[in-house]
Design a protein with these regions (language model features):
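Selective recognition of specific alpha-helical transmembrane segments in multi-pass small-molecule
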Residues: 141-152, 235-251, 262-282, 315-316, ...
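Flexible loop linkers connecting adjacent transmembrane helices
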Residues: 71-101, 125-127, 131, 135, ...
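N-terminal alpha-helical transmembrane segments of multi-pass membrane transport
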Residues: 2-113, 117, 128-134, 145
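Helix-loop-helix module between adjacent transmembrane segments
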Residues: 63-64, 112, 141-166, 177-214, ...
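Alpha-helical membrane segments and immediately flanking helix-loop junctions
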Residues: 90-127, 155-179, 195-201, 305-352
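Extracellular/periplasmic helix-exit of transmembrane alpha-helices
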Residues: 152-160, 164-165, 272-290, 298, ...
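Membrane-interface loop-to-helix entry segments
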Residues: 55, 63-80, 192, 196, ...
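C-terminal membrane-solvent junction of multi-pass transporters and transport-like membrane proteins
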Residues: 184-188, 192, 412-452
Length: 452
């Protein structure tokens, strides 16, 4: 209750301050200096692209080869684990398993942190920049990223901590510390764990909450016809209360919500995409031909060649499915199992759902829409359609509106659901990282929730 009151007072204070100066501007001014420093270190470029993309994709390819394509060999097994087919086999003689949630709940929680507005706006941006060929490389990156998820989530379960009350604490903070200690690099492990925890907390405040809340507020204001910062603050207040009620109950309540919301929102979006694709059945073959052709022989304006399109697709996929980021292993660590690798198998389904399925669906809708020549591929990420500039989610919305009357209501619902689910998961990631740094007591718990 104290947490909820604090959240309300904070947001009311922000809404009052926003009358003097825009809230977005205040936040930008406060965090810009620190953000610039971190961006320069983390996203330094090599050949015009962030080095972290080379690292993530290279690691994914390495794990795929070393483990002999687990993304393909164990795909069916992963589905069976999620279905609970092997639950009896996972029981020990004492008939007990550490953990707090089921395989499906852990998967739903992790997927809710990755399937977000990037699947709507990010894909549109990638296609606008690199053309249809970017879709091919997104799919490739998603497929090999499955192997990375397999590795990091197996480690998350293997090195997790379980307290006397059965509460689980896991993620990169723990497997970096324990794993590197086993190999004689104890100090390096501790430093790496602290750096990850700090970055994860920052991510939970920024991209995990603030950015998602902001995007949801924008689409709701547009739909309702409001154009004030105060309206955005009130929408943020409602979202904060909703998310706060959920996360205050811990991983069990989070999992019970995500196991219902994630399948619903994913199915809703996929069905809408399938309706549009099915309504244009004759274009499907041409769309896939264009995706493959443009992947190796791009014609988008301003695209330098195959490597440029490849990097655009890889960049979008890597940041969409978060393979290699380590965040998903925090959710998967809470699973009820005595076999770490079983949850690694479950985790490899995430990039497939996020990138290979949902991102590809969005891409096909946009590509089919543009067979009419609505806009030119390439440029700075924005496209002109009938003399109006569209960017990100606006491109996707325009494509949907062409085939589904009143689609703004559907897309607004999708964006809000995606945003809320991402906020829920990333709040959990943040609080787990916070507890690693400042202890697992009630005070540390309340301080984070107050700040979030």
């Amino acid at each position: 209750m104290n947490y909820m009151i604090a959240q309300i007072l904070n947001l009311i204070n922000y809404s009052i301050l926003s009358q003097e100066k825009g809230l977005d501007q205040r936040i930008d001014e406060a965090f810009q200096p620190v953000s610039d420093i971190f961006s320069g270190v983390i996203f330094f470029t090599v050949g015009d692209y962030p080095f972290v993309i080379y690292l993530l994709v290279g690691s994914a390819l390495f794990f795929t080869l070393v483990f002999l394509f687990p993304n393909i060999r164990y795909f069916a097994t992963a589905i069976n684990v999620v279905r609970g087919k092997y639950d009896n086999l996972e029981k020990t003689e004492s008939d007990s398993k550490d953990g707090e949630v089921s395989h499906f709940q852990a998967l739903a929680t992790a997927v809710s942190g990755t399937v977000g507005n990037g699947n709507i706006a990010g894909v549109a941006l990638a296609i606008a920049l690199g053309g249809p060929g970017a879709t091919f490389w997104m799919i490739v990156c998603g497929l090999i990223g499955m192997s990375t998820k397999f590795v990091e989530c197996t480690l998350g379960v293997h090195y997790r901590d379980v307290d006397k009350d059965g509460v689980v604490y896991g993620g990169p903070m723990y497997y970096l510390t324990k794993g590197l200690k086993e190999r004689g690099f104890e100090k390096l492990g501790k430093v790496a764990a602290v750096i990850f925890a700090i970055c994860c907390i920052g991510g939970s405040f920024g991209g995990g909450n603030a950015a998602q809340s902001n995007q949801a507020a924008i689409v709701l204001k547009d739909l309702l016809g409001y154009d004030s910062t105060f309206a955005g603050a009130m929408i943020g207040l409602i979202l904060a209360i909703l998310v706060g009620i959920i996360i205050i109950g811990g991983i069990k309540r989070i999992a019970s919500v995500t196991e219902k919301v994630v399948p619903f929102m994913a199915l809703l979006y996929i069905l809408a995409c399938l309706y549009i694709i099915g309504s244009n059945f004759s274009f499907i073959d041409d769309a896939f031909k264009l995706i493959i052709t443009e992947a190796f022989n791009p014609t988008a304006i301003g695209v330098g060649g195959t490597i440029s399109v490849l990097m655009i697709g890889f960049q979008r996929a890597a940041f969409s499915n978060e393979a290699g980021a380590g965040s998903a292993s925090i959710a998967h660590s809470a699973v009820k199992t005595n076999y770490a690798a079983s949850e690694g198998l479950v985790a490899l389904l995430e990039p497939f759902i996020d990138t290979v399925v949902i991102c590809t669906m969005t891409a096909l809708v946009i590509i089919i829409f543009n067979f009419s020549g609505a806009f030119m591929y390439g440029g700075e990420g924005g496209v002109l359609i009938d003399g109006v500039l569209y960017e990100g989610a606006g491109i996707t919305a325009k494509a949907f509106d062409q085939y589904i009357p009143g689609s703004e209501y559907f897309l607004t619902t999708a964006v809000v659901l995606f945003a809320v689910s991402t906020m829920i998961s990333w709040s959990y990631y943040g609080i787990q990282s916070w507890k690693y740094l400042f202890g697992k007591g009630r005070v540390a718990d309340m301080v984070y929730k107050f700040m979030c």
